[in-house]
Regions:
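Bacterial Sec-dependent N-terminal signal peptides
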Residues: 13-42, 105-129, 268-274
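Solvent-exposed, low-complexity, repeat-rich "mucin-like" stalks and linkers
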Residues: 27, 37-66, 365, 692
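Surface-exposed binding patches on compact interaction domains or structured appendages
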Residues: 55-84
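A short beta-strand micro-motif common to beta-rich folds, especially ectodomain repeats
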Residues: 94-105
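Aromatic, loop-rich ligand-recognition surfaces of beta-strand-rich domains
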Residues: 158-213, 229-274
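Pan-zinc metallopeptidase signature
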Residues: 272-328, 334, 653-716
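Beta-strand-enriched, solvent-exposed domains that form extended recognition/catalytic surfaces
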Residues: 275-444
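Catalytic cores of extracellular degradative/oxidative enzymes
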Residues: 457-659, 668-671
Length: 716
């Protein structure tokens, strides 16, 4: 017994020693980790107040390391695995530098923070050559819209009025606009500023006269594609013109208009660009020459030192660099193709920069080879004309030329590059643009083509700090409230984009534009999230109130109980033009709505029953049989609104035709053929009777059979 007790004591002692030894070994095996990446040790800021978060790899508590700043305009805030560095606005005229000293028991780092001052660059502007008089072959006189308004330097945005051909009638093409000059200064190029509506230029020719040659000489043929943005075009050769003649052959909606026509001589003295090219490989300043010295960099204007230094020491933030230095692809003219395809205008904001500005911000835009194409930048802000905030359909537009451009923002907004042209033109090549550090603030965007994954979407939307965030699909652009978008789709954006792209592409199938989209026309439909209203469609955009984003973006909801009807209905408004006439505005587009819910494969079609069987006593609305066979009413009297429209009933006519020819397989090309025929055989008036009869005739031709009985049954 004594031996047993003795043995037990020895065993306990042995176990205690083992445990104690294990504890010592465990404590000794813990290695302190405290690492800051080398690329984070240099931080550059522009003049504005800002902050950046630096990742720290560590297993230490916040209390076990510290960060101290060396100047009062600089602050450092410690977190578990990161360090936030903040700077005040630099209101001085000089660059300033300070340090953040970070220390732990094992590692010490010095983070060098440089903040640059306000832009000090001076742009050598080209020389404007002003006409002293002008003459037009036709112009509106009541009210006065004479050609003088196109060279008075008073833009519409500033309270001016444009030149406009006669109202209420198609222009007598070609419309001739002549501008008269002293003839003492070369003219190299001109900028055509549009009237944001009717009359934007399509095709035209330009001719010039000189003191030596009083006969007009052809300078070139141009096509501005009726796009609603300033367009720049060069003359074939510089000329000291006494007259410049525009022979306009086409304009939007059959009119001709011009806000301002400006003529310029290029400034041959451009010391800034010459200086930049001693350091950078090209004028976009996106890469420095390999043998550049710090002395050469320091000789640049202060504004460009920041960019050159960031490129030289590889401290240009990768996220910022992705959106500040980009190649922008060409897009078609949404105005031109709306006319050709008989649709409402698609969006033309296809090229977001991911950079926003505040009112008063100065932004430098560096433009590379334009390949002779016309580009500009547009600042899209908000409008409140309806009593609530929503994204504007257009904003201040700044024409861009190759080289250094500088603009001052008149409002807070997102910058979009406007590069709209004939995309089949061999010269329609990507254009490289750099918006350097210190100009605007990066918010970013998500592009399905570029970023591709849900993980990348989450990373980008988490970094964004602007009110709106842009998601680019193949056919749709969602420009929605950042906060509500993130709440509705925190991660799985790919399924949302797929649904919206599909809705648009299915509708395009019915329209028969497979030979057009995207080879000739490649614009997106542009969706916004107003803070009032509900769902609607207009020229250039469709709207969904920001409180329903969860309903229209989540796949599980959109696929259930015909919830895709609303989005498909609004997209249908964009596409319905060829089969629409007065009294069908809210019903002809429902061909697309019904087709969408059919393609989703979840639900039956929607609309009033054609007849009421005995067991359907719960049907409250009048049916086709009741309207035609009991009341003997015509199509235009089916409804009770001011146009006689009954959307639920009228929508059934197109859907009957689709079911018979497409679903039953009698002619699966019926609707694509019908849309093409309607585009080829347009009615020149808005008269609903003429349009209705044209629809019936073209439907017979598309079906290759007589549908008279069918349309008579529908009250034609």
């Amino acid at each position: 017994m004594k031996n047993s007790g003795y043995c037990l004591s020895l065993i306990c002692l042995f176990i205690s020693l083992c445990l104690y030894g294990c504890k010592d070994n465990a404590e000794e095996s813990i290695t302190e980790i405290f690492e800051i990446a080398t690329e984070d040790l240099i931080q550059n800021f522009s003049k504005d107040a800002a902050n950046v978060s630096i990742s720290i790899t560590t297993n230490l508590n916040v209390d076990n390391w510290e960060a101290k700043v060396t100047d009062k305009w600089l602050r450092a805030t410690q977190f578990k695995n990161s360090l936030k560095i903040s700077v005040d606005a630099n209101i001085g005229s000089n660059r300033r530098t300070a340090n953040v000293k970070v220390s732990s028991a094992t590692k010490h780092y010095t983070i060098t923070v440089t903040q640059y001052s306000a832009s000090d660059i001076v742009i050598e502007e080209d020389i404007q050559v002003k006409p002293y008089a002008g003459k037009a072959s036709e112009e509106e006189t009541d009210p006065d819209r004479s050609i003088e308004h196109s060279f008075d330097n008073k833009f519409i945005a500033d309270g001016g009025v444009p030149y406009h051909s006669k109202w209420g009638q198609s222009a007598d093409f070609p419309v001739i606009l002549e501008y008269y000059f002293e003839g003492n200064t070369d003219i190299d190029y001109f900028i055509y500023h549009t009237n944001s509506g009717n009359g934007t230029f399509g095709k035209f020719d330009v001719y010039t006269q000189t003191k030596e040659n009083t006969e007009y000489v052809h300078q070139g043929s141009y096509d501005f594609n009726m796009r609603n943005s300033p367009s720049i075009a060069s003359l074939k050769t510089p000329v000291k013109a006494t007259k410049v003649k525009f022979e306009v052959h086409s304009g939007k909606n059959g009119y001709v208009s011009c806000d301002e026509m400006q003529f310029f001589k290029k400034n041959k003295k451009n010391t800034l660009e010459e200086q930049l090219l001693t350091v950078f490989t090209d004028i976009t300043c996106s890469e420095i020459k390999p043998d550049v010295t710090q002395e050469q960099i320091e000789a640049l204007p202060e504004f460009f030192i920041q960019t050159a230094s960031a490129l030289k020491d590889d401290s240009y933030n990768k996220w910022e660099k992705e959106f500040r230095i980009r190649e922008y692809c060409p897009y078609s003219s949404a105005d031109e193709w709306a006319d050709k395809l008989m649709t409402r205008k698609y969006g033309d904001l296809d090229n977001p920069t991911g950079i926003y500005v505040n009112e008063g911000d100065e932004v430098v835009v560096l433009v590379g080879n334009t390949h002779g194409q016309s580009i500009s930048i547009q600042n899209i802000g908000e409008e409140t004309s309806k009593g609530y905030a929503q994204t504007s359909v257009n904003g201040d537009i700044y024409p861009l030329k190759e080289g250094v451009n500088k603009l001052t923002a008149k409002q807070t907004g997102m910058l979009f590059v406007m590069y709209n042209t004939n995309i089949q033109n061999p010269d329609a090549q990507p254009i490289k643009i750099h918006i350097p550090l210190g100009g605007g603030k990066v918010c970013g965007f998500f592009s399905l083509k570029e970023h591709q994954t849900n993980e990348k979407y989450k990373e980008l939307i988490d970094k964004a700090d602007y009110k709106y965030f842009c998601v680019i699909g193949n056919a749709i652009i969602l420009y929605f409230h950042h906060k509500q978008l993130k709440a509705a789709v925190p991660y799985d954006i790919l399924s949302s984009i797929e649904l919206w792209d599909n809705m648009i592409q299915w509708q395009q199938e019915l329209m028969g534009i497979e030979d057009v989209y995207p080879k000739q026309m490649n614009n997106h439909i542009f969706a916004i999230s107003p803070e009032g209203g509900y769902m609607w469609a207009s020229e250039g955009r469709i709207g969904f109130v920001y409180t329903v984003l969860g309903d229209i973006l989540r796949k599980s909801y959109l696929m259930a109980s015909r919830n895709s009807w609303g989005p498909a209905h609004e997209i249908g408004h964009v596409h319905q033009g060829a089969i629409n006439w007065a009294s069908t505005t809210e019903s002809s587009n429902n061909l697309f709505s019904n087709y969408t819910i059919y393609k989703f494969g979840q639900n039956c079609s929607r609309g009033t029953e054609l007849a009421v069987p005995e067991y359907a006593a719960n049907v409250k609305k009048a049916t086709l049989v009741f309207r035609r066979c009991v009341e003997n009413k015509a199509w235009c009297d089916f409804g009770t609104d001011y146009q006689g429209e009954d959307p639920e009933m009228h929508a059934r006519m197109n859907w009957q035709l689709w079911n018979y020819y497409h679903r039953c397989g009698y002619n699966p090309q019926f609707f694509p053929t019908l849309f093409k025929l309607m585009r080829e055989n347009r009615v020149s008036t808005q008269d609903p009777g003429e349009n209705q009869m044209m629809y019936a005739r073209m439907a017979c031709r598309a079906a290759n059979e007589n549908l008279t009985d069918f349309f008579e049954r529908w009250g034609f």
